[in-house]
Amino acid sequence: MSTIKDSNLASIGKDEVNWAQRQMQVLEDIKLDFEKRKPLDGLNIGACMHVTKETANLMLTLKAAGANVALCASNPLSTKDSVAAYLAESGIQVHAIHGVSNEEFFEHLNSVLDTKPDITMDDGADLVSLLHTDRADVPVMGSMEETTTGVIRLKSMEKNNKLRFPVVAVNDSDTKHLFDNRFGTGQSAMDGVVRATDLLIAGLNVVVVGFGDCGKGVAERAYGMGAKVTVVEPNSVRALEALMHGYEVKSSINAAKIADVIVSVTGNMHALDKQHFDVMKDGVALANAGHFDVEINLEALKEHSSSVDRVRDHVESYKYNDKEILVLAEGRLVNLAAATGHPASVMDMSFANQALAAEWIKDNYKNLEPKVYTLPTEVDLKIAATKLGLMGGELEILTEEQIKYLDSWEHGTS
């Protein structure tokens, strides 16, 4: 039994899912193969992910492989109710409604775990966390993690000998983090900022906090829209890289003083805190494109504000001392709450990794330790080659002579 908003939205969801499928041909090829082989036949798969049209295509691929699939949302504001309705109609157990309370959010997580999944999929390690605390009663073969934030949490668990089953860090596959994180986050985060605020980005001072793959993407897209980009980054190598890309590189305090828009992409807590609010300009807009809603210290902001008013869909105005600070999407993921998330074409590769990881866990879990794993390189290369061809690219083929030269040590300067 699913928990959704309105089953009558299914026809709308079907159109949205089918539109995304047009741009997800790598995943579609896997789905056709899975339909023939049924590699996940009889397995229960529990997923905690953003309930979007792209995710729907992954869920339908797993179902085509023979799995019984249950899905809940990884973010209360990212659920597309029409997509949830269509998936429920298609035989996927769905527990997701846009805008649910925290209590309902965790009820939905538990509903997925009540299906006794053999394999779980996470977008932030919420299911895995429950499987190591309140729901340690549920045995699983293994799990998968989609995000940088989730992988950090899992590697910490492994380091402290707390992880009790193998997990595939899908985020660490090149065909995920080099494309989804950079190009997907960059485009969708700036799309969310523009949709929420209707700002002209050209000429604004846009501060990007964090210069990992996601931060690089946001900085590139903001710069491409005409912004004056400043990067905040604690890692000296990344900071130097940002500088050589042509961006200003400043401390968070000095960057906060000049910002018109700040996008936090750190995966860490309180990247924007009271000391930053104190020096910000009147009318600054704050957005989170990292993961959890802790990057902006909203408790401190609210505590020291005389009023909080919703002035526009996805925009809250905090009256902080004698100025206004605008928070987008309640400090949650701006690209999913205020826009439609990553383009389907880039999620195609990420979800191809997820689908293949499910089969890999099923085939190998008996020989795996409770550690964080990365999919084999050949999986990455196969996904990349397929996507390259679909986008009209051509792969260079080395000659036998060139391959032999690269494998030898005898040849040098003659």
Regions found by a protein language model. Give the residues of each.
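Ligand-binding pocket scaffold of soluble enzyme catalytic domains
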Residues: 4-9, 15, 28, 36, ...
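Adenosine-phosphate binding glycine-rich loop
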Residues: 9-26, 40-44, 52, 165-203, ...
